[in-house]
UniProtKB/Swiss-Prot annotation:
GO terms for cellular component: plasma membrane; protein N-acetylglucosaminyltransferase complex. GO terms for biological process: protein O-linked glycosylation via serine; regulation of protein stability. Keywords: Cell membrane, Membrane. Disruption phenotype: No glycosylation of serine-rich fimbrial adhesin Fap1. The unglycosylated version of Fap1 accumulates which is larger than the wild-type protein. In a deletion mutant, GtfA (Gtf1) is less stable in vivo, no longer associates with the cell membrane and has an increased protease susceptibility. Biofilm formation decreases. In a double gftA/gtfB (gtf1/gtf2) mutant, there is no further affect on glycosylation but biofilm formation is further decreased. The gene is gtfB. Required for the polymorphic O-glycosylation of the serine-rich repeat protein Fap1. A stabilizing protein that is part of the accessory SecA2/SecY2 system specifically required to export Fap1, a serine-rich fimbrial adhesin encoded upstream in the same operon. The GtfA-GtfB (Gtf1-Gtf2 in this bacteria) complex adds GlcNAc from UDP-GlcNAc to Fap1, attaching the first sugar residue. Cannot use not UDP-Glc as substrate. Stabilizes the glycosylation activity of GtfA, causing it to partially localize to the cellular membrane where it is more protease resistant. Interacts with glycosyltransferase GtfA (Gtf2); probably forms a heterotetramer with 2 subunits each of GtfA and GtfB. Part of the accessory SecA2/SecY2 protein translocation apparatus. InterPro entries: GtfB. Belongs to the GtfB family. This is UDP-N-acetylglucosamine--peptide N-acetylglucosaminyltransferase stabilizing protein GtfB. Signal peptide: none annotated. Pathway: Protein modification; protein glycosylation.
Length: 439
């Protein structure tokens, strides 16, 4: 079985994890390789360029630059200077604070980009993008470690040239290149599971023949089915016979949109998220914010005097937060490092999602995976998928949150119940729904 992803999005990683943890193994392929694919995930590029899984990421100041040029850097990005002229920008792979090079924009003296080098997790440049003077992309080329050009894509025309095993192959459409890859890969093509109606669907469609393909739908739906989904339900595909929806509300909407005869093709399976630890009902509260606008914080810190509040920020803190930090049960962590944040996630058993402004570093998901009790006000909810409705309180009555918490002794049981309500499907459900497609 093949799992086919167009991009390595968080949704793709979640599906990969859910299937692996359910014991449903297969080959995961990403069509667009950023050079930092996790172990066990491959791409057409790694196949044709015969990438050796050897080496380590390139640290930003190890980049080779012309003699007497200088490299400077922050935890956001690096820069390359020729005296007072900036000649390059170094972009880091996530997490940025590690400063591993993902790409380097090379600049003309006027600051425009003429070329971007793309680095992989083994520390060498595996691709290069070329730009016209108007900053439009012209070509992207892929190389072996020794620098031999293997693949060249004309972005404007869509033409692809592949130099492989002593022959040059010309493809006028990208889908034809991918079909060539699958036919040469030696992989079992009897079942392809994909999560996009873009290129992965086209590959399934044009590959033809008999197959047991599945579309995993991880997006929202409008009031009309997408065109390629209509093709699936009309029976015009020889391979895709099942659609798995991973959001319950979208699942219900899809059932409403399709004809009665097609409903049997549709099933629901939520994502299965990691559970990295248990909740120990400690009175340790975590808040992560880059804003001093924290809903109800005065009321909460006063009413929950027996609880310790750990308030962290990736930035410096305003006088307003510094004043809150004067309270005996409040500890502040300005300019907090990601490592400190992870340490606090292990130390705390309650996460208050009560900061206004943007969510910081997917903190709500990180808290959910570590079984923290997640509470919020109705005007501060971030990442609502991880919030149970029972843990969301009226912001005009901030004391209701603290009153509720004071009456709760066993956080672990509540967290377990909420998790089951939000994501009821288990590994057993995955096998039950999918087993006929992996036999």
């Amino acid at each position: 079985m093949i799992r086919l992803f167009e991009w390595l999005t968080q949704e793709s990683l979640d599906l990969h994890y859910s299937l692996e943890e359910s014991g449903i193994h297969g080959t995961s392929i990403v069509l667009n390789d950023d050079g930092f694919l996790p172990e066990g995930i491959i791409s057409p590029y790694t196949f044709f360029c015969e990438v050796e899984m050897d080496g380590s990421p390139l640290y930003f100041n190890q980049l080779e630059v012309p003699y007497l040029w200088q490299i400077t850097g922050t935890n956001i990005e690096g820069e390359i200077w020729n005296r007072s002229s900036k000649r390059g920008v170094i972009h880091y792979h996530e997490p940025k604070y590690l400063r591993f090079v993902q790409s380097v924009d090379w600049l003309y003296p006027d600051g425009s980009i003429y070329m971007t080098d793309h680095y992989n997790k083994y520390g060498w440049a595996f691709a290069r993008t070329y730009f016209f003077s108007d900053q439009q992309v012209s070509h992207k080329k892929y190389y072996t470690k020794s620098g031999q050009e293997v693949l060249s894509e004309n972005i404007l025309t869509g033409d692809i040239l592949l130099n492989w095993k002593g022959k040059v192959y010309h493809f006028t459409k990208k889908v034809d290149f991918f079909l060539f890859y699958f036919k040469k890969s030696g992989l079992d093509l009897s079942s392809i599971w994909y999560n996009s109606l873009g290129m992965p669907f086209l590959i399934s469609y044009y590959l033809g023949g008999e197959g047991r393909d599945i579309l995993f739908w991880q997006e929202n739906l409008a009031d009309q089915l997408p065109g390629n989904m209509q093709i699936i339900f009309s029976g015009r595909t020889s391979r895709t016979k099942k659609v798995i929806v991973q959001d319950r509300s979208v699942y219900k909407k899809l059932l409403h949109l399709v004809e009665e005869k097609n409903k049997e093709m549709i099933s629901f399976l939520n994502i299965i998220y990691p559970k990295l630890r248990e909740n120990y009902s400690r009175k340790e509260i975590l808040i992560v914010t880059n804003s001093d606008q924290i809903e109800g914080i005065e009321t909460l810190t006063d009413n929950l005097s027996a609880y310790t509040f750990h308030i962290g920020a990736l930035t410096s803190m305003s006088d307003k937060l510094q004043n809150i930090g004067q309270k005996e049960n409040v500890l502040l962590y300005p300019n907090m490092s990601p490592k400190t944040m992870l340490d606090l996630l292990e130390q705390c058993d309650i996460y208050l999602d009560i900061n206004h402004g943007n969510e910081v570093l997917s903190i709500v998901r990180l808290a959910f995976e570590r079984s923290l009790l997640i509470l919020a006000y109705d005007n501060t909810v971030h990442s609502p998928i991880f919030h149970h409705e029972s843990g969301i309180f009226n912001h005009s009555k901030p004391q209701t949150l603290s009153d509720w918490l004071l009456n709760l002794d066993d956080y672990s049981q509540t967290v377990s119940c909420w998790r089951s309500d939000l994501f009821p499907m288990t590994y057993r459900d995955y096998k039950q729904v999918l087993v006929s497609n992996v036999d």
